[in-house]
Amino acid sequence: MKRVLISVSNKEGIIPFARKLVHLGIEIISTGGTATLLREAEIDVMEVSELTGFPECLEGRVKTLHPVVHGGILADRSKDSHMKTLEELKIKPIDLVVINLYPFKETIQKKNVTLEEAIENIDIGGPTMLRAAAKNYRHVTVITNPEDYHAVLEEIEAKGNTEETTRYELAKKVFQHTSQYDTLIAGYLGKDELVFPEQLTVTYEKVQDLRYGENPHQKGAFYREIGCEEGTLASAKQLQGKELSFNNINDANGALALLKEFQEPTVVAVKHTNPCGVASAKNIDEAWDKAYAADPTSVFGGIIAANQVIDAETATKLLEVFLEVVIAPGYTPEALVLFKQKKNLRVLELSSILAEPKGQMDMKKVLGGLLIQEYNTGLIGNLKTVTEKEPTTEEIEDLLFAYKVVKHTKSNGIVVVRNQQTLAIGPGQTSRIWALENAIGNCIHPLEGSVLASDAFFPFKDCVEVGAKAGIKSIIQPGGSMRDQESIDACNERGMAMVFAGVRHFKH
């Protein structure tokens, strides 16, 4: 290895790396700010403009886009014709390319960044050189991440060059990196448009490998959507406990999505992504009491999410139950000390717990493809009473509460509520009446004076009849069935109120 080209925006570790290369007798070529930095560190360096005989121009937009640079990178050393051309054109081979790109991601994450600022941080020459070096990996080593400096130096020191297997792995990293870079740019430029493009490319960054996937025989990992981390598990801080599992993250996400529906102090308990206890109250301690009382059996081994700081009083109660995860915007110091009694309990802090994520698309993988839709951010359309009896103010509050919960319950879903507390939840049934019967059958509370929410319309009046026998007084459903009038008449005959929400909330 004789020659390296270095041009980096991330200067981490570059000085000791370059100094070692010089010690190994490798000539350094560099550009602009990187060359200045290396010279200040008393490292010998040749400017790219000296190599090409052509100055940097257009305020630095054109630095390395030159045949002398790309010929030196792309020449296939195994072909005599390529090497003869280099000799005729007096082009020197470049054996190592060290580049990281303009910080486009960091730029667009700044508050109030302008389009002009973002555009100026779109790298052109960098990706071109990276791709050229990666294409010619049989002869050229390419580095785009400072984490690879040490391993590459070790190989050069030991063998005078890198192994082809190493160059191949580094080349793969380059194409992943440049693909992600271009996807970020395309996403940013189209961020104000909700469109379904003819070709879709998405980019995520790995947060962590997981012990396994949904089941022990499946491998798994967790990735974050770049630029959409605020208010999501990707930005949560784990304060204690075992490593998060695939199912922990999936269930915690379900709890978090439901919690975002509420502004008042609320606790959400989730099991297998379905809510099993939800309650609002004047404070988090009381909300937990109500959420736990809703279904103390199902909450065992569940996920708890709260939208206010958890104090010692609430923490003491949480410790009485076996829980997998607790997530909240914060904890008092006393609460954190108490949680240490259960070292395996995963305690997550998410200060922006009520912030709405910036991502616009909801995606579901299917065999051979991907389903994409807008996020379900609405709750109701025009709330309309369709029965002779009007619901009371208190009943309307409970109806809306129940509709928020059923929106996040697997279809067919039924939720029964009284006083801002779930009493019965029937999720994921293939028949709506079965969902109601399941909810009532597993309920430990009297249902007199409660309200019922259904995620979709009643195809028959049977849910009204069964609900009335259980003591339910008011119902909220989207409406839209050809048999709506049968359900309305059944309510009128029983003195019940029914409102149409105008918006369906299937969840699969």
UniProtKB/Swiss-Prot annotation:
SMART domains cross-referenced by the UniProt entry: AICARFT_IMPCHas, MGS
Catalytic activity: (6R)-10-formyltetrahydrofolate + 5-amino-1-(5-phospho-beta-D-ribosyl)imidazole-4-carboxamide = 5-formamido-1-(5-phospho-D-ribosyl)imidazole-4-carboxamide + (6S)-5,6,7,8-tetrahydrofolate; IMP + H2O = 5-formamido-1-(5-phospho-D-ribosyl)imidazole-4-carboxamide
Pathway field: Purine metabolism; IMP biosynthesis via de novo pathway; 5-formamido-1-(5-phospho-D-ribosyl)imidazole-4-carboxamide from 5-amino-1-(5-phospho-D-ribosyl)imidazole-4-carboxamide (10-formyl THF route): step 1/1; Purine metabolism; IMP biosynthesis via de novo pathway; IMP from 5-formamido-1-(5-phospho-D-ribosyl)imidazole-4-carboxamide: step 1/1
Superkingdom per UniProt: Bacteria
UniProt xrefs under InterPro entries: AICAR_Tfase_dup_dom_sf, Cytidine_deaminase-like, MGS-like_dom, MGS-like_dom_sf, PurH-like
Annotated keywords: Hydrolase, Multifunctional enzyme, Purine biosynthesis, Transferase
Signal sequence range: none
EC number(s) from the headed UniProt entry: 2.1.2.3, 3.5.4.10
Claim: Ligase is one of the keywords in the record: no
GO terms classed as biological process: 'de novo' IMP biosynthetic process
A GO molecular function held by the record: IMP cyclohydrolase activity
A Pfam family assignment: AICARFT_IMPCHas
GO CC terms, sorted: cytosol
Annotated ranges, domain MGS-like: 1-144
PANTHER family tied to this protein: BIFUNCTIONAL PURINE BIOSYNTHESIS PROTEIN ATIC (PTHR11692:SF0), BIFUNCTIONAL PURINE BIOSYNTHESIS PROTEIN PURH (PTHR11692)
Domain text: The IMP cyclohydrolase activity resides in the N-terminal region.
Family named by the database record: Belongs to the PurH family.
Protein's name in the database: Bifunctional purine biosynthesis protein PurH
Species for this entry: Alkaliphilus metalliredigens (strain QYMF)
Gene behind this protein: purH
